[in-house]
């Protein structure tokens, strides 16, 4: 158990579905936030938490 995190080591945060995850500070489960990308963009939504659907995404450019 990481002292900085409420989740078990290697597990996922309880706030994994939200971009307001400020309580979790352990690198093992902290994920960055990004807008959800349109269908067909394979580069996005990998290792990040989607904060909402979007027709445009910087990582799909």
Swiss-Prot record:
The modification N-acetylmethionine is found at residue 1. A divalent metal cation 7 binds at residues 50, 57, 59-60. Coiled coil: none annotated. A divalent metal cation 6 binds at residues 37, 41, 44, 60. PROSITE patterns: METALLOTHIONEIN_VRT. A divalent metal cation 5 binds at residues 34, 36-37, 50. Gene3D superfamilies: Metallothionein Isoform II. A divalent metal cation 4 binds at residues 33-34, 44, 48. It holds the Pfam family Metallothio. A divalent metal cation 1 binds at residues 5, 7, 21, 24. Keywords: Acetylation, Cadmium, Copper, Metal-binding, Metal-thiolate cluster, Zinc. Residues 30-61 are annotated as: Alpha. The keyword Kinase does not apply. Belongs to the metallothionein superfamily. Type 1 family. Class I metallothioneins contain 2 metal-binding domains: four divalent ions are chelated within cluster A of the alpha domain and are coordinated via cysteinyl thiolate bridges to 11 cysteine ligands. Cluster B, the corresponding region within the beta domain, can ligate three divalent ions to 9 cysteines. This is Metallothionein-1.
């Amino acid at each position: 158990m990481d002292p900085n995190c409420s989740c078990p080591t290697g597990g996922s945060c309880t706030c994994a579905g939200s971009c307001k995850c400020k309580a979790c500070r352990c690198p093992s489960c902290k994920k960055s936030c990004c807008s959800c990308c349109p269908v067909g963009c394979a580069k996005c939504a990998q290792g990040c938490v989607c904060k909402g659907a979007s027709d445009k995404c910087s990582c799909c450019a």
